[in-house]
């Protein structure tokens, strides 16, 4: 019997997933049910693109609902108030110097379930995230990337 994957996640991440789940189960399901009803009213399903699209949307939403429910069921919730600021861990905000672009960047280290690179939320399983875990202020890390090696220095941990 295989073990379920545990998802490391913050309280904020749990809240965000719960909100998305509620939206999908209520609003989105109703919208799709209505689309299917309208598409069925067109008759012949063999060439009914509206029906096919609605069924595809339904499959996507139901898949996402199952995925979120699984994440929440198998969540390992991190209490950010108990984090120490001397070592990088999931839930830490880390200010680093990126030597390649000569700039300072703040990353939030989160579990894979709530990673969002656009918001600088990087997964503890990502190359940069995993290299930062366990490091301290002043430490430097090197991360292999497709076009070489990126180098960072940890400036602060919050």
Swiss-Prot record:
Example of a GO MF term: RNA polymerase binding
GO biological process terms held by the UniProt record: DNA-templated transcription elongation; regulation of DNA-templated transcription elongation
Keywords (A to Z) from UniProt: Coiled coil, DNA-binding, Transcription, Transcription regulation
InterPro entries per the UniProt record, alphabetical: GreA/GreB_C_sf (IPR036953), TF_GreA/GreB_CS (IPR018151), Tscrpt_elong_fac_GreA (IPR006359), Tscrpt_elong_fac_GreA/B (IPR028624), Tscrpt_elong_fac_GreA/B_C (IPR001437), Tscrpt_elong_fac_GreA/B_fam (IPR023459), Tscrpt_elong_fac_GreA/B_N (IPR022691), Tscrpt_elong_fac_GreA/B_N_sf (IPR036805)
Coiled-coil features, chain-numbered ranges: 14-76
Keyword Transcription listed: yes
A Pfam short name: GreA_GreB
Family the entry assigns: Belongs to the GreA/GreB family.
Protein function: Necessary for efficient RNA polymerase transcription elongation past template-encoded arresting sites. The arresting sites in DNA have the property of trapping a certain fraction of elongating RNA polymerases that pass through, resulting in locked ternary complexes. Cleavage of the nascent transcript by cleavage factors such as GreA or GreB allows the resumption of elongation from the new 3'terminus. GreA releases sequences of 2 to 3 nucleotides.
PANTHER family named in the record: TRANSCRIPTION ELONGATION FACTOR GREA
Name used for this protein in its record: Transcription elongation factor GreA
Protein's organism: Clostridium acetobutylicum (strain ATCC 824 / DSM 792 / JCM 1419 / IAM 19013 / LMG 5710 / NBRC 13948 / NRRL B-527 / VKM B-1787 / 2291 / W)
Lineage of source species: Bacteria, Bacillati, Bacillota, Clostridia, Eubacteriales
Gene: greA
